[in-house]
Curated annotation (Swiss-Prot):
Species: Bos taurus
Taxonomic classification: Eukaryota, Metazoa, Chordata, Craniata, Vertebrata
GO cellular component: high-density lipoprotein particle; very-low-density lipoprotein particle
Localization of this protein: Secreted
Range of residues in the leader sequence: 1-27
Identification of the protein by name: Apolipoprotein C-IV
PANTHER family from the UniProt entry: APOLIPOPROTEIN C-IV
Amino acid sequence: MSFPGCRPQALASLCFCVLVLACVVACQQEEPEGTLSPQPAPARSSWSLVPGKVKEWVEPLVNRTREKWKWFWGPTAFRGFMETYYDDHLKDLGSRARAWLRSSKDNLLNKAHSLCPQLLCRPSDQN
């Protein structure tokens, strides 16, 4: 059987497509519509194995590091660190802050007076 204006190669391709379509329709009709079949597990590619391998290599390293540094995060070491930090940096913070504010205020007033014209900001004893 030949169709007018069709090449033999096109006819073979058309027949193949019709055959595939018929197989797909037949396979869909074989399953009852009320039942759900479990989806097959996807084939595991080499990229899907990467997270497992990374976890396998990193987990022992993390566990060893955690064990070695457990003493640092204990209450005695941390308390000692905080006491030393307070003694070194925060003990006299209030007095240092007050002194800094005083000197900043004095510096700011001196700059303001230096920018002020002599006529407006003349000292009061020069009347």
